């Protein structure tokens, strides 16, 4: 069932950790879940073009429950920080107004955006909205990820592809993407692209490598790690959604 589940959720507690970390009484859980949702929504809407890949929220100190530490991972930290930190200060003020708590905001740079599934999916959505051909969009994204050091990449686009009357799904994959291997560090993201023909769904899977005993997920996601020479060279393959029977891609 590794093909059907969300790879991020399937690996929680094994090689991945939670983006929201706090320990409270059962009665407080619903309120904090809602608060985390509103915090992420506010940050994403406040800085729409800042290429945010992840937002971590921590409430770890029981003695100081009114303090929240928020870490924003972005490929464009300058957009969030702003000139002399003006944009960051405005964002902190809005977060304090929303939560009525003391907020500590950390802005962390994503050093290699070509290996991040969410940033790749967002970039693909932007290109599709600009009417670029969907097959070219997939191949360009895959080539960039492999060049950046990914061990394998798989993409899937669903909807009215090319303006067709009947919606369908079409994907492209290169390298290894072992969805059934729980120690495999697989980054997954799903994004929507709003085009003139309707909404297209975009899914991206990126295999960074296997997390062996004594290692962490950070060891497989170094800023740049060239592909191992032991990795078998597999031919690119196209496939259609809902069908796991891969078809060899035609040679150009």
UniProtKB/Swiss-Prot annotation:
The keyword Endoplasmic reticulum does not apply. One of its GO terms (cellular component) is cytosolic small ribosomal subunit. Binds the lower part of the 30S subunit head. Binds mRNA in the 70S ribosome, positioning it for translation. GO terms for molecular function: mRNA binding; rRNA binding; structural constituent of ribosome. Gene3D superfamilies: 3.30.300.20, Ribosomal protein S3, C-terminal domain. Pfam families: KH_2, Ribosomal_S3_C. Belongs to the universal ribosomal protein uS3 family. This is Small ribosomal subunit protein uS3. Residues 39-111 form the KH type-2 domain. The lineage of its organism: Bacteria, Bacillati, Mycoplasmatota, Mollicutes, Acholeplasmatales. InterPro entries: KH_dom, KH_dom-like_a/b, KH_dom_type_2, KH_sf_prok-type, Ribosomal_S3_C_sf, Ribosomal_uS3_bac-typ, Ribosomal_uS3_C, Ribosomal_uS3_CS. It comes from Phytoplasma sp. (strain PY1). Keywords: Ribonucleoprotein, Ribosomal protein, RNA-binding, rRNA-binding. Residues 222-252 are annotated as: Disordered. One of its GO terms (biological process) is translation. Residues 241-252 have a biased composition (Polar residues). Part of the 30S ribosomal subunit. Forms a tight complex with proteins S10 and S14.
